[in-house]
Amino acid sequence: SLLEFGMMILEETGKLAVPFYSSYGCYCGWGGKATPKDATDRCCFVHDCCYGNLPDCNPKSDRYKYKRVNGAIVCEQGTSCENRICECDKAAAICFRRNLNTYSKIYMLYPDFLCKGELKC
C-alpha cells in the first residue's frame, strides 16, 4: 500500500514521500502523461507501468510486509498481489535512491498542465 511504499522511500532516500515524491514531475503522484522530466520522474513512470501490469490488484491499498536484510529490502511472502506490489515499490524506492544526485526541487509540486503528450509503457 501507499503506507509501505512511503516507508521504503524514506528508508532508501532519507526523504518523506510527501512532499518530495507525491507530486514530482509528470509521473510521481496520481496519473501521469508526457515525457518524464528527469531520472526521478522516470522512476515514477516505470513504477506506474509496473502497477499497470497488476490489473487484478489494488496497489495503493493492498498491504504487504517487507524487511531489511543487511540494508536491502526483502519482500516477505504474501499473496501473489502483495508480492508483486512489493516488488514494484521496492524497485521504485531503489531507483529514487540511485537518482538522488539529480533530484531537482523545480519539479516538486510540478503543475499538471505542463505535462503534455502520451508515453506508452
Curated annotation (Swiss-Prot):
UniProt-recorded Gene Ontology molecular function terms: calcium ion binding; calcium-dependent phospholipase A2 activity; phospholipid binding
Stored Gene3D superfamilies: Phospholipase A2 domain
The reaction(s) this protein catalyses: a 1,2-diacyl-sn-glycero-3-phosphocholine + H2O = a 1-acyl-sn-glycero-3-phosphocholine + a fatty acid + H(+)
Compartments where found: Secreted
One Pfam match: Phospholip_A2_1
Entry keywords, A to Z: Calcium, Disulfide bond, Hydrolase, Lipid degradation, Lipid metabolism, Metal-binding, Secreted
Residue numbers binding Ca(2+): Y27, G29, G31, D48
Cofactor-binding details, from the entry: Binds 1 Ca(2+) ion.
Subcellular location, principal: secreted
Disulfide cysteine pairs (residue numbers): C26-C115, C28-C44, C43-C95, C49-C121, C50-C88, C57-C81, C75-C86
InterPro entries assigned: PLipase_A2, PLipase_A2_Asp_AS, PLipase_A2_dom, PLipase_A2_dom_sf, PLipase_A2_His_AS
Cofactor: Ca(2+)
Signal peptide: none
A GO BP entry: phospholipid metabolic process
Any single Gene Ontology cellular-component annotation: extracellular region
Active-site residues per Swiss-Prot or TrEMBL entry: H47, D89
Expression sites (tissue/organ): Expressed by the venom gland.
UniProt-listed Enzyme Commission number(s): 3.1.1.4
Protein family membership: Belongs to the phospholipase A2 family. Group II subfamily. D49 sub-subfamily.
Purpose: PLA2 catalyzes the calcium-dependent hydrolysis of the 2-acyl groups in 3-sn-phosphoglycerides.
Descriptive protein name: Basic phospholipase A2 3
UniProt organism field: Daboia russelii (Russel's viper)
Taxon lineage: Eukaryota, Metazoa, Chordata, Craniata, Vertebrata
